[in-house]
Amino acid sequence: MTTQNQNTHQQTVFAMVVGEHSGDTLGAGLITSLRQTHPHAKFIGIGGPKMLALGFESLFAMDELSVMGLVEVLGRIRRLLHVRKTLTDFFITNKPDVFIGIDAPDFNIGLELKLKVKGIKTVHYVSPSVWAWREKRIFKIAKATDMVLALLPFEKAFYDKHNVPCTFVGHPLADDIPMQSDKVLARDKLGLAQDKKILALMPGSRGGELSRLLEDFFESAKQLQAQDSELLFVAPMISEQRANQFNALKAELAPDLDIEIVLNQTQQVMAASDCLLTASGTVTLEAALIKRPMVICYKFSPITFFLGRRFVKLKWFSLPNLLTNKSLVPELLQKDVCPENIVPLVKERLYQDQSQLNDSFTAIHQQLKCDASKQAAKAVLDVLSSKLLSNNK
C-alpha cells in the first residue's frame, strides 16, 4: 500500500470500507451520487466489484471481511485485526476528508472510533442491529461516528431516542426494484415454464448458511414434489463457488432432485417464482419488494446461537416482519427449521391466494422508496460541510 496522499484542494477524498456484496451495492450507489457534485473525487479503502468498476481503489479484497457469526469471526480474528490496523495507520497518515463505513459494524465501528479520535469525520452507513441485540453498542457508535445513515425508519426513531445523529435515507433496493414485477417476463428471460408452480430455494450467500440449511431444504423439496410432480425448483447462486457447494451437497443429499441453478440473477429468479424458501437477511426485503410470498429459515452455528441468544431482544428476525411489526411472513429458527414445519407453510403460499400479503408488501415498498443513494450522499456532504466550517473558524 504505497498510495500517496492526494488530498489537495482540488480533490476530495472519500474513504470507504465495505465487507460484503450488499455493502458493495450501497457503496457503488453512493459513489455515483457523490460524483454528481464531486466529479474528480478520489474513493479509496475496501470495495467490491461494483465499486471497483467505478474507479474505487481497494487496499484489500472485500472477501477479507466477509465473515458472519461469532465462531466464524474468531477463526479469522488475527487477520481481521491486521487489516483494521493497516487501514487505521494508512488513513491517519493519508487523511481522507470523510470516512464512510458501510455495514460490517464489528469491523468498521472500531475503525471509525480510531479515525474520529484523530479528527477525521466519520459516517456509518447501515445501522447495526442495536435495536435487536447488544443495545449498549449505541454508546460506542455515538463516540465513533458523526452521523449514522439508517435504511429503515424504526432505526432512526431508536437513534433519536438516544440523541445520536442519524438520517433515514430509505433503502436502495426500494429504488431499484419496480413497484410491479413481471412474472411472465422473468420466466421468459430464464427459459422457465409459464404453466407450472415454481419454488425458489435460497439457502443464503455464505458457505456456512448453505451447509446448515440445505439438508432441510432438499428434504422439504422432495416431499413437496411427491405431492405435486409438476412443481419446479430453481436456486439462484451469487457465485460459482456457492453453486459448486450447492451441487456437491445436492449430489450427497438429493441426487434425484431436479433443481435449476441460475447464476447472478437472484431478483429475476424471485420474480419468476410463486414462493421462496429462503435464508434470512437482506434477501427477504428483496422478496417483499418483488411481492413474492416466502418462508424464512435460519440456523446459526450451535455455539453462535448459544452465546448470542441472551443478547437478542427481538420478537421477529426478518425485515418484512420488523417493518410491519407483525407476523407478516413465517419465520423458522434453529431446530424449528425442519421439513415438518417447512412443507405446510410452503404449500399454503404456493396454492392459496396471496393478494392481501401483496398489499402489505406494496406499503413497505412505498415507505422505503426515498432515492437512498441521493439522500445518503447529501448526508455525507453535510458532514463534510461541517468539517470545512470548523476548519475555517
From Swiss-Prot:
Q: Which GO MF terms are attached to this record?
A: lipid-A-disaccharide synthase activity; phospholipid binding
Q: Pathway it acts in?
A: Bacterial outer membrane biogenesis; LPS lipid A biosynthesis
Query: Do the record's keywords include rRNA-binding?
Result: no
Q: Which domain of life is it from?
A: Bacteria
Keyword Transferase annotated? yes
| A Gene Ontology BP annotation from the UniProt entry | lipid A biosynthetic process
Annotated EC = 2.4.1.182
**Could you name the Gene Ontology cellular component terms for this entry?**
membrane
Keywords of this entry: Glycosyltransferase, Lipid A biosynthesis, Lipid biosynthesis, Lipid metabolism, Transferase
Transmembrane ranges? none
Catalyzed reaction equations:
a lipid X + a UDP-2-N,3-O-bis[(3R)-3-hydroxyacyl]-alpha-D-glucosamine = a lipid A disaccharide + UDP + H(+)
InterPro entries found in the cross-reference section: Glyco_trans_19
The family annotation for this protein states: Belongs to the LpxB family.
Q: What does this protein do?
A: Condensation of UDP-2,3-diacylglucosamine and 2,3-diacylglucosamine-1-phosphate to form lipid A disaccharide, a precursor of lipid A, a phosphorylated glycolipid that anchors the lipopolysaccharide to the outer membrane of the cell.
Protein name as annotated: Lipid-A-disaccharide synthase
- The organism is Colwellia psychrerythraea (strain 34H / ATCC BAA-681)
Q: Which gene encodes it?
A: lpxB
